[in-house]
């Protein structure tokens, strides 16, 4: 996770055959993650310092550190009301909490030099995301 790029597999894409096959993925989102309880305990469970956002990425990174693999299972069925508890998908509150969590995640899983070098880019990307979120709210 050296550059801080976090993305769901197939997010905001139309369903297609490429998502119909079991495949490896970099992380599992918290709303649909499933793992053995002994593995969950071995990696230290969820890090409570991530109250919302990136806790699942952190968990997935630690899971992979012990040599485990993460798979996307297309036959699973999950219904998740995205961002409902935080004011909606494009809320400013969500953006703030998400940005703080991303910086915390990168700080936890990257070395200091990478964090220092990447910080200006991360701030720029965060501001672009804020502008896009504002536009999405405007055009809803």
What positions do the PLM features span?
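Helix N-cap/coil-helix junction residues
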Residues: 45-46, 68
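A generic structural signal for short
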Residues: 24-25, 47-49, 91
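Acidic/His-rich active-site region of diverse nucleotide-sugar glycosyltransferases
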Residues: 1-44, 57
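Nucleotide phosphate-binding site architecture
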Residues: 40-41, 51, 79
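Active-site-adjacent helix/loop segment of glycosyltransferases
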Residues: 64-139
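A residue-level structural signature of the nucleotidyltransferase/glycosyltransferase Rossmann-like core
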Residues: 26, 32, 51, 70-71
């Amino acid at each position: 996770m050296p550059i801080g790029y976090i993305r769901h597999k197939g997010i905001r894409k139309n369903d297609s055959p490429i998502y119909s096959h079991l495949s490896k993925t970099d992380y599992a989102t918290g709303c649909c993650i499933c793992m053995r309880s002994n593995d969950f305990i071995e990696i230290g469970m969820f890090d409570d310092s991530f109250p919302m956002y990136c806790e699942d990425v952190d968990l997935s990174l630690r899971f992979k550190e012990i040599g485990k693999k993460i798979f996307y299972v297309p036959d699973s069925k999950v219904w998740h009301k995205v961002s409902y508890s935080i004011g909606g998908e494009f809320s400013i509150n969500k953006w703030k909490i998400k940005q703080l969590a991303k910086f915390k995640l990168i700080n936890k899983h990257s070395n200091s030099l990478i964090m220092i070098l990447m910080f200006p880019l991360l701030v720029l990307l965060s501001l672009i995301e804020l502008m896009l979120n504002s536009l999405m709210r405007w055009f809803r």
